[in-house]
Amino acid sequence: EHFIGHYDGPQGNLLFRQSIAELLKKECGWPVEANNIAVTNGSQESFFILFNLFAGEHDDNQFRRILLPLTPEYIGYFDAGLGQDLFRTYRPKIEHLGPHRFKYRVDFDSLTVTGDVGALCVSRPTNPTGNVLTDTELEQLRRLAAEHNVPLLIDGAYGLPFPNIVFSQATPMWDDNTIVCLSLSKIGLPGVRTGIVVANTQVTQAIRGTNAILNLAPSSFGPLLAQQLLNSGQLIDLAENNIQPYYRSRLEQAMHWLDIALEGTPYRIHVAEGAFFLWLWLEGLPVSSDVLYQRLKARDTLVISGSHFFPDSGTSWPHRHECLRISYAQAPDQVEQGIRIIGEEVRSAYAEDGT
């Protein structure tokens, strides 16, 4: 009856929020209570609310922006603002790791938090690259945000403590100036559209007020389904012993196929530390990644051109047009076939230039 017969409060189901708070205390050691938890109708809504809370036009007539310390970054952020030019972005440092691997790192030498920045935001792991910010990088960003009295937003849709699609060493971090956004989507419940925001009570009260205006209340369906996993203690077990090993196995398969398909070409793959994507860098690609996308689409192979994950900074950077995001979440035979076709089209593209 409670699934469809009652409204929850605008901050979300109280029992669910209490259970999430207890889980975060136990698993992460975070000093949170139910009032530090707000429920939304999915992560996309969480970030829509947060971006427009901390950025855009403010009462002091100043326009504030969201600073993304490391791009490429999640494509879904860039249309979430009610105003234009909502984001300030920074290029990463690129670390070459062996002949065919690389890793993006935050360029702290260039990173500057100016007075018009309303918040910092990172995803961990990152969609599209599978990058996981190191504990050292995250701690440095946390200090930087605190020094400038702006919050640090961490998108944990693929991260810790659940769904834990993380393959590198990483510690979940939260404090009173940090906002962590979680989701039920990657534990197998994408259709229930349930986002979870962990923040200080000033922020959760603001989300509560926004929910009341936009929705009256967030949906009860996801929290009530997940409550069974929380009551039984199975949520973390599901993440650690089912979800993470499943995607790790699929990752190893896909990396093997991609290395075979691209052998002899100047390719690099971002070290896959989390999520379920491979980020392919084709250095010196004679055609743009958008053209390569169209060629692959014509052969029923869907990727996303990397250019869409770098907001236009107004400066030319060839790297933006040399990357593809590849998902390995489909059936293995489909992934293998798609990677084979990617290899054929990449070889063909380099052959046009005599490479």
What label would you give each PLM region?
Residues 286-292, 333-337:
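Short, conserved charged micro-motifs
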Residues 68-71, 121-124, 153-156, 182, ...:
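Short beta-strand segments
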Residues 241-255, 267-282, 319:
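Conserved glycine-rich beta-strand-loop-beta hairpin in the small C-terminal domain of fold type I
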Residues 14-18, 22, 26, 31, ...:
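PLP-dependent enzyme catalytic core of the Aspartate aminotransferase-like
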